[in-house]
Amino acid sequence: MTASTALWAQGPNIEELFKKAGAASDANEPKARQYLYREYKVTNEINEKGESSNRHTETWEAIGLEGSEYRKLVQRDDKPLREKEQKQEDEKLRKETDRRRQEKKGGIKNPLKRSYSFGYTKGDERFFDFRYVGEEVVNGRPAYVLEGKPKSDVKPTNNHEKQLLLSRLKLWIDEEEFFESNFEIEVTGAGVDIRPGTMVAFKQQRMEDGTWLMNEMRVRFILKPLRIANVRMEVLTTRSDFHKFAVDSRILERQ
């Protein structure tokens, strides 16, 4: 076995890989803010038998409003909103439009905001020991696959860190652009309320211009509030109809 073959067999340098992934994420963020989308969310409440006891859906439109993103509810359970709720949404939009216009007059610029949280942020990799487990093809693109287990010698200082140290990670990092294309975090140890099996997974889609956008997120909650009974809920969020908008909120193109 040659030296180069042996190096490849060991996989990529994980520390360098995370540095490149962090830089790719930073470079992608302003480009991602230029995109709007349509969002479809399915929420399932699961009973003790593992059956769906309550299912409902919501459809949202992310629109450009005074130069930034605004999420507008347009359907509930695959049907148009009832008249009363539609009026409430219209009133919310009117008030938000007025608020943003006042901010503009005052010289305050609203950045785009994302409404989701993954329970894992940049820098949290320091709580895990990672190993390279191979390669997989994600949406036709080769990706490095890493698995992370919580470090045994780290003591948490807050609830977020406690959650991390009760979880396992799996990451897919694009080999060409070093962007984190897929991600999974699953709770494996019992905390105060969150139970093992609680999970968040998301997938990213690459646009023609090289921008990466989240197009699917799966969340499974297994909670035991007040230590009384398990509450289980599954949420699937998909995004589609991505399109750019300008600072003046005019739609430019669809992909």
Set out the residue ranges of the language-model regions:
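N-terminal signal peptide c-region/cleavage motif recognized by signal peptidases
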Residues: 3-4
